[in-house]
Amino acid sequence: MKKLIFTLLFAILISGCNNLNPKEIPNEVIVIVELIRNKEKSQEELRQFTKRYSNYVKSTESNTLGWTYHDAGDKIILIERYKNEDANIVTAKNISPAGNRYKLLQESFNYYTLGKVTVIGGFTQKLIDFNKMTAEKVGFTAPFVYYPLISGFSKNLR
């Protein structure tokens, strides 16, 4: 599973390298979410729901750079990319009980359950604290693991 996650992450990070005018994203935050698939839902139902969820995020969170779901057998891997930790905090606010995505988040639990959240990149204690507070509000019990950036770069095609 770790090999799959790191392979997916590597592919995302190098995907913008062929552009002549890439835009650097020095404080990008990447969140890798392991979701446990509800076996009662068909592949087509899952595809339609995740597409709707992705489109909603795309239309409401301008600093969310990517939101992709990946098939991992009994699990689904969701990779979220953010311009910075503030963009990730917008997502946390949106899934909170008063947020614009709270109902959609609750609906998502018909399709999968949360297994683990891994956060990597340019974040500070501010994001860790905000995620902890949000997890308590929403009732997440899955572990959150954090790996801060040491050095490197990320580019976008725009």
Predicted feature residues:
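Short beta-strand
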Residues: 67-71
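Active-site-flanking beta-strand signature of metal-NTP-handling nucleotidyl enzymes
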Residues: 28-37
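A beta-strand edge to alpha-helix "cap/lid" segment located at domain peripheries
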Residues: 19-20, 136-140, 147-157
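Sec-dependent signal peptide recognition
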Residues: 2-7
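Short, surface-exposed ligand-recognition loops at beta-strand->loop->(often short) alpha-helix junctions
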Residues: 36-48, 123
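Hydrophobic residues embedded in beta-strands of well-ordered beta-sheets
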Residues: 76-77
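An amphipathic, aromatic/His-enriched active-site/gating alpha helix that lines ligand/cofactor pockets
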Residues: 58-65, 81-144
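C-terminal motif of bacterial Sec signal peptides marking the signal peptidase cleavage site
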Residues: 15-16
